[in-house]
Every structure is written in C-alpha cells, then in structure tokens.
C-alpha cells in the first residue's frame, strides 16, 4: 500500500492550539462574510464547503455544518442529508474541474482518530491521482499543488454553481 506523505502539514500540526472555545475556527468562518479569503466554495442551507488551507493534495476540501457539533449525533436528519448532498456536489465539481482518478472521503472523530478541530464535525474530500504518492514530499519536504488555492477556489465555485445532475431534484445548486 502506498502512503500519501504530507509533511507540509507539519506547520499546522505544530502550531499552538487554542483550548476548546465557544466558537471553532469553522464557526468563525461560517459567520464571516469574506468567503474569498476563507476559500469558501459554496454555502447551503445548513452547511458549507471550503478548501483546506493545509491540503493533503490539490483540491482537498471540507464540508462543514453551520451547527458546531463534535459528531453526527448532534445533527438532525435534514442537516445530515444536507451535509452528504453538498459532499456529493463537491465530489462532482472536483471531478469536472480536476479529473482525479479517485477520492478519499472521510471523517476523523476524536483526537486519536486524527481530528484537528475536535469540537466541529467536518467531512474531508481528498481527490487522488495515480502516482500522487511521489517523492517530492519525502525528499524535498515540498508539496506539488497544481495551482494556487484562490485560482482553484474560483474554478470550483463556478462548477458548484452548476447542477451536478439537472434531473436531480435534490441537487441544491444555486
């Protein structure tokens, strides 16, 4: 099994962590109106999508409920459905814009599972390509991202503005 090395994330890992606070980073972003600076890609009724500032690969994004909860148990069925619908929309937008060979989509619940923001549930969507476990991160402590976050965010916002499937009544593209 190949490993996906992401040593550039060490900056995030080693950064001082604030103790649990009333408003998580994701809640602060949700309440901000500066979507461009925060790399917010789409906002739905109960959740939003944003690019990860410390990505494992280009296009690594997260789907976050507006409600700050540590796990799925804090969401209503409607909120959970909205979260998964936006995840699907983002996967489809990434497919159209970046044409990956596959995806890792998942959730880290709890510190031992790798959660970086314990108090706020979020879903990771990580596009993958054949051979994306290259030597650059291992030998040069360098990640190769094909384009700047702002440029990629603009492309993904445009893709998310289009329905993934025009016949799907549950596709909430605006």
Model-derived features with residue positions:
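Short histidine-centered catalytic/ligand-binding loop motif
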Residues: 62-84, 139-145
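Histidine- and/or cysteine-centered catalytic micro-motif in compact active-site loops
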Residues: 52-54, 66-68, 108-110
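Histidine-centered divalent-metal-coordination microenvironment in nucleic-acid enzymes
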Residues: 60-65, 114-134
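Long, well-ordered alpha-helical scaffolding segments within enzyme catalytic domains
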Residues: 76-100, 150-157
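C-terminal helix-cap and adjacent tail motif
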Residues: 3-19, 128-174
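A short glycine-rich, hydrophobically flanked beta-strand micro-motif that places a catalytic Asp/Glu
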Residues: 98-111
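Active-site microenvironments that recognize anionic phosphate/pyrophosphate groups
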Residues: 1-58, 63-64, 170-174
């Amino acid at each position: 099994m190949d490993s996906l090395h992401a040593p550039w994330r060490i900056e995030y890992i080693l950064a001082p962590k604030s103790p649990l606070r009333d408003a998580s980073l994701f809640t602060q972003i949700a309440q901000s109106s500066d979507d461009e600076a925060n790399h917010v890609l789409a906002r739905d009724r109960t959740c939003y999508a944003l690019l990860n500032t410390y990505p494992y690969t280009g296009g690594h994004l997260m789907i976050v409920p507006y409600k700050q909860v540590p796990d799925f148990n804090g969401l209503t069925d409607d909120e959970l459905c909205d979260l998964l619908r936006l995840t699907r929309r983002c996967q489809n937008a990434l497919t159209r814009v970046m044409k990956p060979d596959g995806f890792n989509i998942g959730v880290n619940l709890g510190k031992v599972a790798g959660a970086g923001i314990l108090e706020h549930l979020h879903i990771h969507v990580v596009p993958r390509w054949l051979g994306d476990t290259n030597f650059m991160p291992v030998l040069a402590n360098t990640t190769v991202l094909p384009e700047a976050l702002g440029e990629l965010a603009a492309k993904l916002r445009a893709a998310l503005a289009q329905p993934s499937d025009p016949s799907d009544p549950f596709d909430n593209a605006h």
